[in-house]
Amino acid sequence: MDVMTAVLTRRSEHTLRAPAPDDEEFAYLLRGASLAPDHGRLRPWRWILLRSGERAQLGLRIAEESGADAAATEALRDKYQRAPLSAALVFAPRGQRIPEWEQLAAASCVAHALMLLLHAREYGSIWRTGQLATSPGVGRFLGLRGSERLLGVLDIGTPEAGTAQRRRVPDDVSATITRFDDLARHRPDTAPQAEDG
């Protein structure tokens, strides 16, 4: 699959089943994804892979914090077992030389590149954030350290047959593009200066 096809056809897959990449295949795909833009080559991220019952613990931690009743606790436990692999992306800023916002952008680029690589190998994925990413209990369960924070969890598996979503038509983005010379004509501080003659 070429890159443009991967970008145009990737979708968030809500229904995922086995197989998912094993640890070796995940590491292989991550090696490719880690070539995403990363000023200073800091790799300000790490991934924690959760399989089997480990995934249910994410929902149980959220349920505990929110004081959920038994039915809600069960629903949250099930919610985080919808995929055979959950990969938690931990943002781990490194030093002050590269601004933290650039390091955060690098971690985000890695996640997107990984999703495209998974799609190219016929895996599905969906990016989950919300309460999961901000839960102190989930952070403790995952062993976050110091300034680390959870950006989200990527659920990974094989899409269910027959759940292919219709292809989206790319939006017209021309209104978001401005040529600088067009912009400069309307700004007095960039207008050409008359030469003395």
What are these regions (language model features)?
Residues 1-82, 185-197:
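N-terminal amphipathic, basic helical "cap/leader" segment at the start of enzyme domains
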Residues 5-12, 150-197:
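C-terminal helix-cap and adjacent tail motif
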Residues 11, 91-94:
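Short, histidine-centered active-site or binding-site loop motifs used for metal coordination
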Residues 33, 95-141:
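Small-aliphatic-rich amphipathic alpha-helix that forms the alpha element of a beta-alpha
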Residues 52-57, 64, 93-96, 136, ...:
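Short, charged/polar surface micro-motifs in flexible loops or helix N-caps
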Residues 85, 121, 149-152:
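Generic beta-strand structural signal
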Residues 86-90:
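Active-site-flanking beta-strand signature of metal-NTP-handling nucleotidyl enzymes
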Residues 138-151:
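Short, electropositive alpha-helical surface patch
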